[in-house]
């Protein structure tokens, strides 16, 4: 399946289709560019965002705990879309505050 992913970035809104077997960050890097990331392995917070609508599968990640994920935090480098989803990007400072 393919889902519509909407990224709310400091530069504005970006929308594109992402297959459910492709990490959102990997696809977004081709479509949007200029998204923050570091390890690309789900073990840091550089690419953190907040899901405001929809859902993702980020079971490959290890950095976030269950409470953070339930609150909507997402690591875009290890997140597959499981529905149409909206994510606010560039949220590392809020997550680590």
From Swiss-Prot:
It is found in: Plastid, Chloroplast. Its cofactor is [2Fe-2S] cluster. Disulfide bonds: none annotated. Binds 1 [2Fe-2S] cluster. Its main location: plastid. Ferredoxins are iron-sulfur proteins that transfer electrons in a wide variety of metabolic reactions. This is Ferredoxin. It comes from Arctium lappa.
């Amino acid at each position: 399946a393919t889902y519509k992913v909407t990224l709310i970035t400091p530069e504005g809104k970006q929308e594109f289709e992402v297959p459910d077997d492709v990490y959102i960050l990997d696809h977004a890097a081709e479509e949007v560019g200029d998204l923050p990331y570091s390890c690309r392995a789900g073990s840091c917070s550089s690419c953190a965002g907040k899901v405001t609508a929809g859902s993702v599968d980020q079971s490959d990640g290890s950095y976030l705990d269950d409470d953070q994920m339930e609150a909507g935090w997402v690591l875009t480098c290890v997140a597959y879309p499981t529905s149409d989803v909206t994510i606010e990007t560039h949220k590392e400072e809020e997550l680590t505050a």
